[in-house]
Amino acid sequence: MGGVNFLFGLLKAIPCFAFCFSLTAEKIRVASFNLQNYLIMDRVVEGKWMRDYPKPEKEKRALRSILKQVDADVVAFQEIGERPFLNELWMDLNVTKGPVYPHAIWMPAGDAEEVRHLALFSKIPVNSIRMHHDIEFPYFGDRKTPDRGVLEVTFDSNGTKWKLFNLHLKSKWTERKDDPEAKIRREREARAIRDSLRKSNPPEMNSHYLVVGDFNDHRNSAPLRRFLQVNDTVLTSMIPCEDSRGHRWTQHWAKADSYSRFDYILATPPMLKRLVVGSAKIVDGPDSALASDHRMIFADFQF
């Protein structure tokens, strides 16, 4: 009889344990968003050429609406202007009842002439921040570094240490005729960043990290391949984000009316195991078309 009571007690304890475990699990939503020139610049506004003009208010309202809709725990930004522009976005979210982000990070570009910078908002505590400006690569007899650098942020979720690397690779615009669409430079950038990540986060250490941002290239391009695999070693995998119609493009170039997938979330094998199935999305709808020429991407991870 004592054995029966013991077994009954054990069976009662199992669902309790499962329930308690589910309560302690932590789901983190990670997003990446190219804000399309959230800064002062010469631009066309409602059909008129305007000099030294800020991002139009209707575009700002649309992107705030997207941030509120997605309500990510961590969101990486590309194409933000100087620090006051990030402060403006943070304050506008607060006064319009958007998501509250206690942690805001702004990273200046490594190139003094570059006006587009990297940034990050986070609801969860930040363990450490590193701003990489010293990643070098050879380029036509010279030594170069990624113009915008790489922003590295470390978190601890439910006892698991993980990192996010935010980047914005070289665009296809270039004045060099010997490097059409800057393909060589972008590949060299990607290779150098990849090697830096491998050195600080060896694959055999089963590191948890994400590489997110605007890669300015297609999924089968050399820059993307550099991040995915070296010989037989898998470094990261692309998380297949899609919109409500199953489409996967993230950038619309209005001049050519072309649609491309330039924005990605790449996850190491241990991080990929934490992906919540079906959570990887691309935000569509009228606000997306108005806020930026890029669409926000996001995915959930369980810790």
What is the meaning of each model-derived region?
Residues L23-T96, W106-V115, R191:
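N-terminal, active-site-proximal structural segment of metallo-dependent hydrolase catalytic domains
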Residues I80-L169:
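Structured beta-strand-rich core segments of catalytic domains in phosphoester-bond hydrolases
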Residues K48-P54, D71-E79, W106-A109, Y139-G141, ...:
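Second-shell loop/turn segments in exported
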Residues N158-F165, L169-R188:
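Metal-dependent phosphoester/phosphodiester hydrolase catalytic core
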Residues A13-T24:
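Hydrophobic h-region of N-terminal signal peptides that target proteins for export
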Residues V30-L35, L63-L86, V153, L164, ...:
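Active-site beta-strand/loop signature of hydrolases that rely on acidic residues for catalysis
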Residues M1-I14:
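Bacterial N-terminal signal peptides that target proteins for export
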Residues T145, D195-L210, N216-F303:
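Metal-dependent phosphoester-hydrolase catalytic domains
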